[in-house]
UniProtKB/Swiss-Prot annotation:
Binds 1 zinc ion per subunit. Residues 25-294 form the CoA carboxyltransferase N-terminal domain. Its cofactor is Zn(2+). GO terms for biological process: fatty acid biosynthetic process; malonyl-CoA biosynthetic process. Its EC number is 2.1.3.15. Zn(2+) binds at C29, C32, C48, C51. This is Acetyl-coenzyme A carboxylase carboxyl transferase subunit beta. It comes from Yersinia pestis (strain Pestoides F). Pathway: Lipid metabolism; malonyl-CoA biosynthesis; malonyl-CoA from acetyl-CoA: step 1/1. The gene is accD.
Length: 304
């Protein structure tokens, strides 16, 4: 066998081995670049076990992480977006909706459920950032209001996980109207003395940060989450100055008093259960095992 044949044979073996590995088995951490086993990362709640980077998480995964198994009942699932304005930019709005629905399996960018958290009845909502950047539109506002109404009916707390780029431009004024609509609904929660906990994840921007995301009785953020109205690049171009390191990150915001707590995802469920038991004057709930209880600790770091 000639030297060229030996090289070609090695190349064929390598290609055969690569072809045998299905796509999506491995992924790379956006922060440290570590190659991670996808199944292990999912067990770790999308938190890198090497550097503790909190990756983006789907809305349903967040709600399943929070609520007791078997207690989840979805709210407003029948609501679907409509292209009332027949809006078109580089692509028709209805085509963007169809593509987002196909990619995510969701009808719109917010999922709401009622259930229990360690035995306590609660209502929870979560934004799906993969659906058009988690943008707030008519269905998002309607589902959030449905969640508030359910909390009022059940006389229980509401928890919302925000992850959004802001109002959806394709719905124009109707999307901006959701800021007032959701804020007015939350005012009813306040009148009734029912707790509303807002959890800000990466990113929480625009109209969502200017309305429901910052109206919590307690505002909690995940580590290094980008939180603000306009993005850092837009601000730099406007003021023509370099922004300080970590500007608009959760650590910067808690230093300035804009949020109340930073909580790591592995202990988020237990932290929320503890806070809600105090706010509702209920006994400390017994710990119910969940996915969060089996999460690996990052190297050289403890729960904070």
């Amino acid at each position: 066998m000639s030297w060229i044949e030996r090289i070609l044979n090695k190349s064929n073996i390598t290609q055969t081995r690569k072809a045998g590995i299905p796509e999506g088995v491995w992924t790379k951490c956006d922060s440290c670049g570590q190659v991670l086993y996808r199944a292990e990362l999912e067990r770790n709640l999308e938190v890198c076990p090497k550097c503790d980077h909190h990756m983006r998480m789907s809305a349903r995964a967040r709600l399943h992480m929070l609520l007791d198994a078997g207690s989840e009942v979805e709210l407003g699932s029948e609501l679907e977006p409509k292209d009332i304005l027949k809006f078109r930019d580089s692509k028709k709005y209805k085509d963007r909706i169809s593509a987002a629905q196909k990619d995510t399996g969701e009808k719109d960018a917010l999922v709401a459920m009622k259930g229990t958290l360690q035995g306590m009845p609660i209502v929870a909502a979560s934004f799906e950032f993969a659906f058009m950047g988690g943008s707030m539109a008519s269905v998002v506002g309607a589902r959030f209001v449905r969640a508030v109404e359910q909390a009022l009916e059940d006389n229980c707390p509401l928890v919302c996980f925000s992850s959004s780029g802001g109002a959806r431009m394709q719905e124009a004024l109707m999307s901006l109207m959701q800021m007032a609509k959701t804020s007015a609904a939350l005012a009813k929660m306040q009148e009734r003395g029912l707790p509303y906990i807002s959890v800000l994840t990466d990113p929480t921007m625009g109209g969502v940060s200017a309305s429901l995301a910052m109206l919590g009785d307690i505002n909690i953020a995940e580590p290094k989450a980008l939180i603000g109205f306009a993005g850092p690049r837009v601000i730099e171009q406007t003021v023509r100055e370099k922004l300080p390191p970590g500007f608009q990150r959760s650590e910067f915001l808690i230093e300035k008093g804009a949020i109340d707590m930073i909580v790591r995802r592995p202990v988020m469920r237990q932290t929320l259960a503890s806070i809600l038991s105090k706010l509702t004057h209920q006994p400390q709930p017994s710990v119910v095992e969940s996915k969060a209880d089996t999460v690996a600790q990052p190297e050289n770091q403890a729960d904070v």
